[in-house]
Design a protein with these regions (language model features):
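C-terminal recognition in membrane/secretory proteostasis and scaffolding
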Residues: 1-100
Length: 100
C-alpha cells in the first residue's frame, strides 16, 4: 500500500531536518529528494522543493502525504493542491492532477 499510492506521484520524499526548519523558519514539511516521470514532474515540481500542505492539510510525514493522496484519488476532483517552499525561501503553489 505504501509505495503504490506514492508511485503515482513519481517522486521520493524525506522529512525535513531541524536545520532546514530553522533556516527556512518553518515547522514541518517533506522534501522532494528525487523526481521521476509522473504527476509531480508534470506539475513542475522539482528536487529540493519542500511540501508543507496538501489540500489545506499540514504534511509532516510520508504517511500524511500518502493519506492525502489516497483521499484525493477517490474524490470527485482527484487533484492535490500543494503549498510549499524552495530552499531559497521562495514559496510556491502547485496543482497536481492524479488522473492518468
Amino acid at each position: 500500500m505504501k509505495g503504490a499510492d506514492l508511485d503515482l506521484l513519481g517522486a521520493n520524499f524525506r522529512e525535513i531536518s531541524n536545520a532546514q526548519k530553522e533556516q527556512l523558519d518553518i515547522r514541518h514539511g517533506l522534501e522532494v529528494i528525487k523526481v521521476n516521470n509522473g504527476a509531480m514532474k508534470n506539475a513542475g515540481i522539482t528536487k529540493g522543493f519542500i511540501i508543507q500542505t496538501v489540500n489545506n492539510q499540514a504534511v509532516r510525514t510520508i504517511e500524511e502525504l500518502q493519506k492525502a493522496v489516497k483521499e484525493a484519488s477517490v474524490s470527485k476532483e482527484p487533484v492535490l493542491y500543494i503549498q510549499g517552499i524552495y530552499p531559497t525561501g521562495k514559496k510556491a503553489y502547485f496543482a497536481v492532477s492524479l488522473e492518468n
